[in-house]
């Protein structure tokens, strides 16, 4: 009897920590993931441009918002200090094709567009999968495809884990990716912009980072802060399968974390993709209430 009671208590405790089943709510403009009735995240397919913002800041095809299990949105979009920053997004400030340079980071030259998307629920509602196919185009001509995969897990213990992958393929001509042109910076690749917050703390495997960082390799980075009085954190982990070893990361206390690829070292500051030979990058993200 005692053993049965203990098993019941343990089962009840697990249920308290587990969320309701995940489900997708789809519209022509976005896919929303919900855990029961609670919003988890949205992927925005349609062009986004709030009233009063310059037309050249229009964009699509990124994650925003992303909420913790207790409902704190940690992502920012159209922040006045960097209007081109947009939730969780894949972008490079230098994309070279056919002798021309384009800036996906700052929304100049290359245009992103969605081609298709497929949302699934697996494991009895414990896992959600979103597969997205986007393109980059110049003057209406497609120059690259982007296959994005997002796997989102049911929340547990006040946290939620997501795995994210990009497969980028040049189409008819070689495509060169570089980070920032500034000598001491190398942002470009996988990027996260944070919502307005207070008491920001950034950590890596080396401990608390008191200053902003560029060009330093890190296996993970986390930003914790107070959002309207509620403490939450987002952590990025590099996948060991990614090319290039431990990546350089861009850490900004104004509210930005980025994983730089290919980074900037004396040995390499660019990577060229040959047509039909894809590049795949993988990262995991964990959001948590503190």
Spans of model-derived segments:
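Hydrophobic h-region of N-terminal signal peptides that target proteins for export
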Residues: 8-18
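Extended, loop-rich substrate-binding clefts of extracytoplasmic carbohydrate-active enzymes
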Residues: 9, 83-158
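Acidic (Asp/Glu-rich), glycine- and aromatic
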Residues: 43-46, 54-56, 155-203
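Beta-strand-rich recognition/accessory modules
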Residues: 234-290
């Amino acid at each position: 009897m005692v053993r049965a009671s203990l098993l019941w208590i343990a089962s009840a405790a697990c249920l308290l920590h587990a969320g309701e089943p995940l489900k997708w709510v789809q519209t022509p403009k976005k896919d929303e993931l919900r855990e029961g009735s609670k919003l988890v995240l949205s992927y925005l397919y349609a062009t986004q441009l709030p009233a009063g913002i310059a037309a050249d800041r229009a964009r699509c095809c990124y994650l925003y918002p992303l909420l913790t299990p207790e409902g704190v949105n940690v992502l920012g979009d159209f922040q006045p200090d960097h209007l081109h920053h947009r939730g969780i997004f894949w972008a490079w400030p230098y994309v070279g094709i056919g002798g021309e340079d384009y800036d996906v980071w700052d929304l100049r030259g290359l245009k992103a567009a969605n081609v298709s998307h497929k949302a699934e629920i697996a494991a009895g509602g414990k896992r959600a999968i979103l597969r997205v196919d986007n393109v980059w185009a110049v003057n209406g001509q497609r120059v690259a495809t982007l296959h994005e995969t997002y796997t989102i897990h049911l929340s547990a213990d006040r946290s939620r884990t997501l795995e994210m992958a990009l497969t980028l393929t040049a189409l008819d001509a070689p495509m060169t990716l570089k980070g920032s042109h500034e000598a001491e910076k190398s942002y470009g690749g996988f990027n996260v912009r944070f919502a307005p917050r207070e008491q920001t703390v950034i950590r890596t495997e080396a401990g608390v980072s008191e200053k902003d960082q560029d060009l330093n390799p890190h296996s993970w980075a986390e930003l914790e802060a107070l959002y309207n009085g509620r403490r939450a954190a987002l952590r990025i982990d590099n996948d060991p399968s990614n090319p290039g070893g431990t990546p350089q990361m861009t850490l900004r206390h104004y509210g930005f974390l980025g994983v730089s690829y290919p980074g900037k070292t004396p040995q390499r500051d660019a990577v060229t993709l040959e047509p039909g030979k894809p590049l795949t990058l993988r990262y995991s993200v964990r959001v948590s209430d503190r």
